[in-house]
């Protein structure tokens, strides 16, 4: 018979008491009243925060957007096909956040920062809130460094600086994405991290852009955030904020970043869909009342950090689509008022073969020449005025039969300048090449050539200058000034190349 010793029993009881875990886990739960169209109505969830993540029984995540007196309106981050009426929901106590790290470079991810390129998981050790406050006034400094796009029309007349927000606006199929992707290609070797956010686009279009980046070696410094047209509205609405959080991660590490939102019209439409389904009152064009805040809180995150914060920068190029050139619609006017200028792409110019189809007359950069190197200021100062006068003259010349010699000369010069601004896609130019091109046009060296010969001559001149007068490029890149020596070298090269070119044409 086993004898029971009292001291052993007391030891066992004491051990049990010591191991007893008094921690009580409180979970805030609710039940689904109604679900459908990417929206769920939840009863309960008494202490849920606005924007808090909630988790359904079958693991779908949602965001609590509407906090009403008797229920909570939740938008789903998934199809939610397995969610049933009466199933339970629990609040997670977290606001939407994503993991961030340098390992995201070269990857294609979705709005939840999950990789969708089939190249495995991304290792991260840090996370950032998707929505974080924009830098304050003290944390910023004024924009002073240029961010070269590689497009002559933009870098000479509508310059963009690091930390600026410049809107790209135009009808569908006018080359808006091409301007943005060319800008990314031109950042090669410039130590700029690029984030391309595709919102509500065709998967084939996004694949095309990614392939082009890979072929040109641009994916090394680029992150693509993609939510295609078949994604839930919630994810299309979140995608730009995810991109901004990734760009901010690098900005606060004293790096320069460029972020492209392609396009914010689709994000506004996704937000409108969510708001109407949540029964929020519609306003102008059926958009909810806070659609301005939707874009302002996103674009205000782009900044040039002060020297105290390491002078990093985040440059934003939002894209907005217009309907038959109507810039006075709701979303275009909102975004124009938030940004520091706009590049207007015209369908008429595009169809007339002027590409990039930038309407220089109504495009503007509110940073202006502060975002240009001295050499570009010296050369391009008169260009915008000359083109504006030419456009006016051209309209007038359609009605006049006999024009005086001076007017004819001005028209001829304008036609050649317009020819210089044409550029094939995915062929960005260096600043030195742009300066050479503009100088050649504005100083009348092309006036003797036929319009059809202008581009051929300029291409040959670029090659000639590179091989025979390489000092020109060195002077501009080192001094950032169009010195007398550089001008003499360029004049020499133009004259030598012009002689060769005319001989070739005669042969």
Swiss-Prot record:
Organism: Silene latifolia (White campion)
Alphabetic keyword roster: ATP synthesis, ATP-binding, CF(1), Chloroplast, Hydrogen ion transport, Ion transport, Membrane, Nucleotide-binding, Plastid, Thylakoid, Translocase, Transport
Gene Ontology molecular function terms on file: ADP binding; ATP binding; proton-transporting ATP synthase activity, rotational mechanism
Subunit structure: F-type ATPases have 2 components, CF(1) - the catalytic core - and CF(0) - the membrane proton channel. CF(1) has five subunits: alpha(3), beta(3), gamma(1), delta(1), epsilon(1). CF(0) has four main subunits: a, b, b' and c.
NCBIfam families in the record: atpA (TIGR00962), PRK13343.1 (NF009884)
Pfam families: ATP-synt_ab (PF00006), ATP-synt_ab_C (PF00306), ATP-synt_ab_N (PF02874)
Record InterPro entries: ATP_synth_asu-like_sf, ATP_synth_asu_C, ATP_synth_asu_C_sf, ATP_synth_F1_a_nt-bd_dom, ATP_synth_F1_asu, ATPase_a/bsu_AS, ATPase_F1/V1/A1_a/bsu_N, ATPase_F1/V1/A1_a/bsu_N_sf
UniProt-annotated location(s): Plastid, Chloroplast thylakoid membrane
Name of this protein: ATP synthase subunit alpha, chloroplastic
